């Protein structure tokens, strides 16, 4: 009978799965890295030789913004650059060294995410089996979406690494670094602000004495939430993360002015995407003129109907996010996953890059789920299948010039239903008792 190996925690928190003399844990890191590097090289060839480019248009925007910085100009001189200037600074080597530098940076962030996932899993589930750990890591490192998004030159892995770094340092009881990385992640992209309340509640007055493996939703006590709402640990997290965000934002504002605030943050509140959008609000957005594209358009060009959509779309998000937080904040990884899926599914703009937001968290909930590998595959098939009609309709629109906007909207509705179905399945199969079975050894 084969003996099931479990995590043998040592000072380095190393745990490797060995199969027939092969270290599969290390191998999967190597394979994931090699696949990404090969695709970066392939992208150079395809971009030079084929009509359809492999590289994402966003990467061209990043690079143009970095070129502006090198030339002493503002990154916002490049139209459609709607990110923090820090991203343009990071990609200056695109201009000075090689245009593919940024893709390599994003791939490195992919690998950092995998490292952080492993560290969090070992802290959170001390008795996790080596097979389960391997599956968790493979679900990120071999995920075709994470591979594609980074190698095409989208920066979502940078933000994902920051969010997971914050969670990682929470499990390591380093509240200062956790706060800094969280504030940095919100500065880079505003969406991690949805994690603020669950993270705040997770840091209770016993934060430094409780092991990461002792937190489950079975321990939720709503009376204690308000009784110790302003404990010193929570206030430290709030003050340091707020200082990090505000100081970086203020510095960028001093350098670039209002255009920085608008393009980096305000634009995303009123953004309307009438083409590459899975959202259930897509058709309403299509039927109305996009809200605004530049700062100069802001005055007098905000369409009233789209503004209503922009504001109304936040209401179901806020209600659901608060409900999820109150129920699951002690199962922080599960809470963050549910919040991310909910936020993306109900958002007025939903694109492929957003999927990385929850794919980088998904591996953390696999050990506490009653779903088996086959069930996960079925859910993935449902999720992918629901996108088939959307991609078909989008292809007809983009490449054949057919008017398929209504078809795209219907496909978006099916995709929304698929996301809700997956969300319900995850909730029904989340097992706090199973979590406890992983916890008692440390």
From Swiss-Prot:
Cellular component, GO annotation: endoplasmic reticulum membrane; glycosylphosphatidylinositol-mannosyltransferase I complex
GO molecular function, one term: glycolipid mannosyltransferase activity
Membrane-topology annotation of the record: Multi-pass membrane protein
TM helices/strands, residue ranges: 22-42, 95-115, 177-197, 242-262, 307-327, 336-356, 361-381, 408-428
Annotated GO biological process: GPI anchor biosynthetic process
Top-level enzyme category: transferase
Main location as per UniProt: endoplasmic reticulum
Recorded superkingdom: Eukaryota
Compartment(s) of residence: Endoplasmic reticulum membrane
Family designation: Belongs to the PIGM family.
The protein's role, per its UniProt record: Mannosyltransferase involved in glycosylphosphatidylinositol-anchor biosynthesis. Transfers the first alpha-1,4-mannose to GlcN-acyl-PI during GPI precursor assembly.
Protein name: GPI mannosyltransferase 1
Organism, as annotated: Dictyostelium discoideum
């Amino acid at each position: 009978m084969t003996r099931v190996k479990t995590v043998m925690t040592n000072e380095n928190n190393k745990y490797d799965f060995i199969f027939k003399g092969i270290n599969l844990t290390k191998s999967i890191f190597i394979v994931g890295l090699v696949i990404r590097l090969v695709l970066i090289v392939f992208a150079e060839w395809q971009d030079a030789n084929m009509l359809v480019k492999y590289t994402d248009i966003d990467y061209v925007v990043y690079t143009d913004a970095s070129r502006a910085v090198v030339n002493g100009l503002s990154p916002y001189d490049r139209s459609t650059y709607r990110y923090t200037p820090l991203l343009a600074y990071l990609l200056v080597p695109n201009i000075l060294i090689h245009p593919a530098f940024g893709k390599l940076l994003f791939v490195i962030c992919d690998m950092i995410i995998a490292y952080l996932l492993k560290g969090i899993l070992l802290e959170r589930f001390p008795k996790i089996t080596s097979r389960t750990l391997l599956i968790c890591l493979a679900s990120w490192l071999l995920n075709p979406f994470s591979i594609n998004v980074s190698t095409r030159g989208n920066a979502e892995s940078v933000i994902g690494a920051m969010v997971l770094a914050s969670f990682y340092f929470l499990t390591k009881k380093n509240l200062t670094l956790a706060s800094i990385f969280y504030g940095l992640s919100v500065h880079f992209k505003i969406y991690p602000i949805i994690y603020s309340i669950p993270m705040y509640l997770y840091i209770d007055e016993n934060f430094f004495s409780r092991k990461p493996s002792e937190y489950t939703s079975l321990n939720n006590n709503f009376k204690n939430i308000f009784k110790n709402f302003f404990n010193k640990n929570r206030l430290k997290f709030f003050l340091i993360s707020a200082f990090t965000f505000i100081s970086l934002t203020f510095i960028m504002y001093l350098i670039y002015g209002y255009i920085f605030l608008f393009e980096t943050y305000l634009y995303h509140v009123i953004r309307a995407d009438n083409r590459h959008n899975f959202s259930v609000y897509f058709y309403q957005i299509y039927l109305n003129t996009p809200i605004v594209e530049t700062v100069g358009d802001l005055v007098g060009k905000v369409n009233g109907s789209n503004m209503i959509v922009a504001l109304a779309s936040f209401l179901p998000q806020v209600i659901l996010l608060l409900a999820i937080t109150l129920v699951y904040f002690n199962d922080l990884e599960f809470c963050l996953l549910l919040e991310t899926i909910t936020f993306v599914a109900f958002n007025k703009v939903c694109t492929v890059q957003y999927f990385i937001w929850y794919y980088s968290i998904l591996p953390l909930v696999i050990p506490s789920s009653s779903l088996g590998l086959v069930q996960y595959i079925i859910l993935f098939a449902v999720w992918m299948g629901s996108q088939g009609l959307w991609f078909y309709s989008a292809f007809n629109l983009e490449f054949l010039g057919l008017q398929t906007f209504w078809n795209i909207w219907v496909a978006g509705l099916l995709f929304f239903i698929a996301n809700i179905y997956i969300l319900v399945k995850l909730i029904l199969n989340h097992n706090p008792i199973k979590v406890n079975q992983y916890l008692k050894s440390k």
